[in-house]
A protein has these predicted regions:
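A membrane-cytosol interface segment of integral membrane proteins
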Residues: 124-145, 150
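Residue-level preference for the first positions of well-ordered beta-strands
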Residues: 79-81, 148-154, 182
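Soluble extracytoplasmic domains of inner/organellar membrane proteins
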Residues: 141-142, 149-173
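Soluble, non-transmembrane catalytic domains of enzymes that act on hydrophobic metabolites at membranes
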Residues: 1-9, 64, 68-72, 92, ...
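A cross-family acyltransferase "interaction/gating" segment
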Residues: 114-116, 163-244
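A transmembrane-helix-recognition feature enriched in membrane-embedded lipid enzymes
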Residues: 3-70, 117-121, 219
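Catalytic core of membrane glycerolipid acyltransferases/transacylases, capturing the structured
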Residues: 32-44, 48, 62-64, 77-132
Length: 255
């Protein structure tokens, strides 16, 4: 009888652990909303206090998700325009724990339950894809850069499975030129237990957030390699800068 029960107990354990992690995430989101309210993040999202609280909250989130990071290189000191390949919704917290940064996100995120509130609390800039507002958004980003706020963008405009990097849209590369701040490329690579690329961790196509998260919660560990490239001077036209940054990201993923 014992021999029959024991395997079932072992089979249940991963599901219990997954449910426990999910509960912790829900509680952590509510904690984040409470923290954002207490420190006034919804009204003044760009204060240093909010940035420190954001880094703390993101680090705790990665701990809940059992994320282990391998970091190569160092982030640019001071203000920078960060550009990265885009694989998953997890990209943002991974980069956010490395340095103080504000994000450019698709407009739909603003309306996500709870997550949208948190995004607004940390000063996220939203853009509607295909709306033709990239030019005006470049000017807005440049204004933030001039105020000393580092901005992260994903120039592919979508996510991939990590096997390749799509062409970088160049419109937003006008922002660092207008603000005269360096561009720093970075590369994200999600790995399996053998250190090889793991496309299963990508959030692509018609993937739904809650289903993707549910699958991720079953993993013992999520391993991500984040590589910081050499900063680039924002000289030249935006198409040239986009190609140069794209090449730098490809080179880091191939290393």
């Amino acid at each position: 009888m014992v021999a029959l029960v024991a395997p079932q107990a072992f089979a249940i354990w991963p599901e219990l652990r997954r449910l426990w992690r999910l509960l912790r995430i829900v509680l952590h989101i509510f904690y984040g909303l409470l923290l954002a309210t207490v420190i006034g993040a919804f009204w003044r999202p760009y204060r240093p206090l909010v940035q420190r609280a954001t880094s703390h909250w993101l680090r705790c989130l990665l701990d809940i998700l059992a994320v282990r990071m391998e970091v190569n290189g160092v982030p640019q000191q001071g203000t920078a325009f960060l550009v990265s390949n885009h694989v998953s919704w997890l990209d943002i917290p991974l980069i956010g724990v490395q340095r103080s940064v504000h994000f450019l996100s698709k407009a739909e995120v603003r309306d996500w339950p709870l997550i949208g509130l948190l995004a607004r609390a940390v000063g996220t800039l939203f853009i509607r894809r295909g709306s033709g507002e990239s030019q005006s958004k470049s000017v807005e980003i440049a204004q933030h850069l001039k105020l000393g706020r580092t901005i992260l963008v994903f120039p592919e405009g979508t996510t991939t499975d990590g096997r390749s990097v799509k062409r970088f849209f160049s419109q937003l590369f006008a922002a660092p030129t207008l603000a005269d701040v360096p561009i720093q490329p970075l590369a994200l690579r999600y790995l399996d237990s053998n250190g090889q690329l793991d496309p299963a961790l990508a959030f692509v196509g018609d993937d739904e957030f809650h289903l993707h998260l549910w699958q991720m919660l079953r993993r013992d560990q999520v391993v991500v390699r984040l590589s910081w490239g050499e900063p680039m001077a924002a000289n030249g036209d935006r198409d040239q800068l986009a190609r140069q940054a794209h090449g730098a990201v490809l080179a880091m993923l191939g290393s």
